[in-house]
A protein has these predicted regions:
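Membrane-interface helix-cap regions at the ends of transmembrane helices
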Residues: 15, 42, 49, 63-81, ...
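Hydrophobic alpha-helical transmembrane segments of multi-pass membrane transport proteins
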Residues: 31-38, 42, 70, 89-104, ...
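C-terminal-most transmembrane helix of multi-pass membrane proteins
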Residues: 2-12, 60, 268-318
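Transmembrane alpha-helices of multi-pass small-molecule transport proteins
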Residues: 2-5, 9, 25, 49-97, ...
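Specific alpha-helical transmembrane segments that line the substrate/conduction pathway
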Residues: 54-64, 95, 102-131, 167, ...
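Helix-helix packing/entry segments at the starts of transmembrane helices
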Residues: 58, 114-120, 178-185, 190-212, ...
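Glycine-/small-residue-enriched transmembrane alpha-helix faces in small-molecule transporters
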Residues: 1-57, 90-93, 97-101, 140, ...
Length: 318
């Protein structure tokens, strides 16, 4: 019976891995891009009822509960060595600080400005990976498109820019650490496939639990109003699912099969996706400037050549 159960579990994991591998990584990135803006829009509306740091804590804590129920990441934690645990602790602290600073910035600056500043860190990562003239041109087109789309204006509360640039640095660290766990498999359990696409998600779940612990001292007090108001609490849980579960999971599935520089460059699609969502959901018709920006970003991403597969990139020196 035990053998049959193990074989059944192995078969399910193999089938799941096969399904994920058959889907193109860009499809996972597309899902992440949509929710990257849907989540913050819900959060900003909740600021009128719950403190900013309280909303950040609700986002992180609700995501941690979802990952805990879904993936039971404490089982993974028991199998990790000290160096692997350090990476997950680092990612957890980054997630807690990044989400908090992001909302503090959004409370003081337009979302488009915060998003444009956030993209600067990924530009640096994409630049490090632009080892050919073709990729350098692709990067220039994407950056130019983002500049046209966002029309960044340095106006607003100075403290907001401090938070925004802090979030920029932390978002860059999220991409680095997130890509690391996506492409560095943990020793599999018995009869598990060697390349289980859920390995990175399990590690992400452990980091999210750590993030919830790290954010609790600074955010739980501000979240108390939501804990006594069912509608606001449900709203906060929705923010967590839309902002820290769906996009982070799909990020992991995309990162596992894309080089880090390629993933960083594809993040240039986020402002373009925001324009598309504005047209479809809000009826905001884009002008010529928006269409030009989208065209530049799409051309840049299409021109980029991966060169090195994500898993091979991990084995390359340096």
């Amino acid at each position: 019976m035990a053998t049959d159960r193990a074989a059944t579990g192995s078969g399910r994991r193999t089938g799941r891995a096969g399904l994920v591998e058959r889907l193109p990584p860009v499809s996972f990135f597309g899902v992440s891009a949509v929710f990257h803006y849907l989540g913050p829009s819900l959060a900003v509306l909740l600021f009128a009822h719950v403190g900013v740091l309280g909303v950040a804590w609700l986002r992180i804590a609700s995501a941690a509960v979802v990952f805990g129920c879904w993936r039971s990441p404490w089982r993974l934690w028991q199998r990790l060595d000290i160096s692997q645990r350090r990476v997950l602790v680092g990612l957890g602290v980054v997630l807690a600080a990044m989400n908090s600073l992001f909302y503090l910035a959004c409370d003081r600056l337009p979302l488009s400005t915060v998003g444009a500043i956030e993209f600067l860190g990924t530009v640096a990562l994409a630049t490090l990976g632009a080892r050919t003239h073709r990729n350098a041109l692709a990067l220039a087109l994407a950056v130019g498109g983002v500049f046209v789309l966002t029309d960044l204006r340095i106006t607003g509360e100075p403290l907001g820019f401090v938070f925004a640039f802090g979030n920029c640095v932390l978002f860059m660290l999220y991409v680095i650490l997130g890509h690391h766990i996506a492409t560095t498999p943990i020793a599999p359990i018995q009869d598990a496939p060697r390349r289980d696409p859920m390995s990175g998600i399990d590690q992400l779940g452990a980091s999210m639990l750590i993030a919830a612990l790290a954010a609790t001292p600074i955010g739980v007090a501000a979240a108390v109003p939501a804990l006594t108001h069912p509608w606001w609490l449900a709203w906060g849980v929705g923010v967590g699912v839309c902002s820290s579960v769906i996009p982070y999971v799909t990020d992991q599935l995309a990162m596992a099969r894309l080089p880090r520089a390629t993933f960083a460059l594809m993040l240039a699609l986020l402002p373009a996706m925001a324009t598309v969502i504005g047209l479809v959901v809000l009826g905001q018709v884009p002008g010529w400037r928006d269409l030009l920006g989208i065209a530049l970003v799409v051309c840049g991403v299409a021109l980029h050549h991966d060169g090195v597969p994500a898993r091979d990139e991990q084995r390359r020196p340096g």
